[in-house]
Amino acid sequence: MAPLTRYRADNDHVPLPFVEEYYEQRGSVPGTLLVTEATFISPQAGGYANVPGIHNAAQIKAWKEVTDAVHGKGSFIYCQLWALGRAAKPEVINAEGFDHVSSSAVPINMDSPVPRALTEREIQQYIKDYAHAAKSAIEAGFDGVEIHGANGYLIDQFIQDISNHRTDSWGGSTENRARFAIEVTKAVIAAVGADKTAIRLSPWNTFQGMKMADPKPQFSYLVSVLKELKLAYLHLIGSRFDEEKINFLTDIWGKTSPILVAGSLARDASGLMLRASHPNNAGSVVQKYPNSDVVAVFGRYFIANPDLPFRIEKGLALREYDRTTFYTPMSTVGYTDLPFSEEFQNTIHVGA
């Protein structure tokens, strides 16, 4: 399951009690890998209300209940580590006592507030915060952590020249723009081990004012360096446009470790999701990326179908998702009230 922001934490960024049930439901098919919603690494990394954190004792305790529940179903769960940067809502981050910051003083668009460029000291503190959050995640029982380096958030703001206008050692060249992502990854590895560390990237993303004119050299360099760090996996977000492929990155990574691919997975004419991991299926990730160990990642359909892996395997119809419930703060509606398929429930009864 892909990371999915849902705003189901309390006002102190602690996951609410029913978050445990949500993840337990989606880990009900043994062997499923869940990646949590993006989770703040520190108070200053935030800027949205009702998003969970993983940096204090109360948050660790709440997440421990989640990880225990998922492991009880025979599944696995990684915590996605998040810092917003300029994507933060200024009124929220300011109210919490922190500045609105980014790699550079470059706004998302002409109508957005201008963030303050991070200082050298602040950059070093962020790197430490990622490492601390990673340790906290392992303490909370997570199987590993996924560094959120995609979708126009802080790490992505350093990676891409459209948002990074620095002329010091953190910008100005392909190597320097990649440095923050690399240093964060190395710090997390030092904290919890490479086998528990992953990263998510989105070279073709246009969300939040992103996308370089030509992302290939920048992301090729970054992935070539990350490859040498022997991460647990690489998570890539694909594009809906045929000319914007991610094969240039999967080919670099090869079979170093698994690659998770999210976005634009094919559906057949009847509306059933293709069995995207099956090698004999047209449009499968195996056929698209023959030189890598690639796994399909699903997001929104996992919200509406808590037994999604079972439905895909059995070729069952998928329940359509309801966008209006995606971001309803602190509500169980559209969160823990989605039913399992009758067929899956029958297997549970038989097993019992």
Task: Give short role names for the model-derived ranges.
Residues 2-352:
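Flavin-dependent oxidoreductase catalytic cores
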